[in-house]
Amino acid sequence: CGTESNNMIIKSCVEHLGVERIITSPLEHKCVAETCLEMRAKKGIELVCLKPDNKGVLDLAELEKILQSSDKKTLVSLMHANNEIGNLLDIDKVSEICKQNNALFHSDTVQTVAHLELNFAKTLVDFASCSAHKFHGPKGVGFAFVRKSSGLKGLIVGGTQERNLRAGTENVCGIVGLGKALEIFTKNMKEYTAHIQGIKDYAISELTKAIPHIKFNGNSTDSEKSLYTILSVSLPFKNPLIGLQLDMKGIAISQGSACSSGASKPSMVLMSILT
């Protein structure tokens, strides 16, 4: 799955590739954030966080400046699309910056595989992550894209399965399910995108009319800068029952990310752009 993929890539970069510094952001998925913190605590790596603006946009000039400030071997870990506010990162530009500064680049592409056209022959990320359930494949299965020249090694040993990157008997039915779901989604990508983008545009229009002072978080209203599957809003009132009330009307919303379900603390992503 995406979580295991992100863990493996980041930990192996530190343990096997000699990475001494990780540049990331407070917008990352919890599995990336906590893995980076663990590597700082256990391995003593330097951890640098880019500060997003109030729209959740990262300053790539600042990234370049930080990369040029040290000769430490560096991994940049920045997600392609944020799972809470939907902001898209220009991973082609980040790849270019990383290559120019001899840094490794990992992108959590869990939200965008099968939803956007990705070509890793052209977009020169070193590592990327995918999870099948994001395109209606089976839960608990995903993949890690690893550039052959990277030298990355697996963390689970004892067998040569999965190109020596993950020992153990393969989850064949999960892998086949992932492949079939990916095939179906990519074949119908344009149709699916147009349909869901239409629903998102309608929701933005109707919410704006119905709720004065509603706030759309990140770049939610800009289809060029936001993933079509995600719409994040801040309401100008408090209603702890709103999730239940909308569910009774047949409308599903999320009041937090799945990785933080049940948590009483506010979203780290929203805190980083709203405070």
Where are these regions (language model features)?
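Pyridoxal 5′-phosphate
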Residues: 1-275
